[in-house]
């Protein structure tokens, strides 16, 4: 099959794997939390903090961005003309309130010095427009990002193999990864490549792509069944920058004391008791944001798929920024605040995030996102039912 740009493709027996993954997700949650009073998330279980911020969408130069895209992608003039950047969340200059959930990526709560991915789940509030049918809220847009460019899987079948091995036992997962070296490398990269000094100065990528607009004849029942083309496909990124113009990029820094050599006992290297909790990132967030002059910034950027070497359905392949740089369309800002309130922590645990919660024009695309659309509601409903809660949509006006 000759593949095309901006197009997601179905996989063989895809629908069968949806049902299998739902069963595995239920089993995973029962294994983790069946005999406990409260349930955490099945991944990104350890929350560091719930932080309030703002996402400003700039009055960016749409034509300049399209000219840049035209230089990097083999697009016809009609394809370029069909791309509209100023729609949905990006439609006009505006400042939105956001809630940010900072977390570790692991399925259980581990010390922060352990190798892991770090994430921010961004909930943008006050977003108007036609919703995705799978949305669980009416005026929010969720953007989930990690401090790595990749995801752990190439295909839905691969993800089922990985996830079912994870559910069965750590030993089964190790054996599966040994048999799938490319996935082993992806997991190692995702969890071990970065242990940032602060989550407030780390860079984050969405890992999986989203549409930027829909064609007039788009049928939401078709993805996963037949090839579906979009006007454009992008990934999101948040790049830490300094507070003063020209807002230079903040270089990556590692947590002090973390050994650069693999397989070294990190607790020992840091002089920490392995039997005691290590909440380094939560402590850093609390202390950094408690300072009266605290302010942190990230450029909000979009990265276009510009060639078939940047696949939509394969989450392991990196979209190289030298081939398609992130183009700035806004800025995320976090300023001084007190965040160590018990009620705020409870509020944070009860928030529900999904890439499928948002506007139709920002539809998540690709195999990994189609899986998430099936599995995320199962996990979220389990977690809320276990807590005896009915989901409530946040407004950004909450106080604690």
PLM region descriptions:
Residues 1-400:
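Active-site-adjacent core segments of small-molecule enzymes
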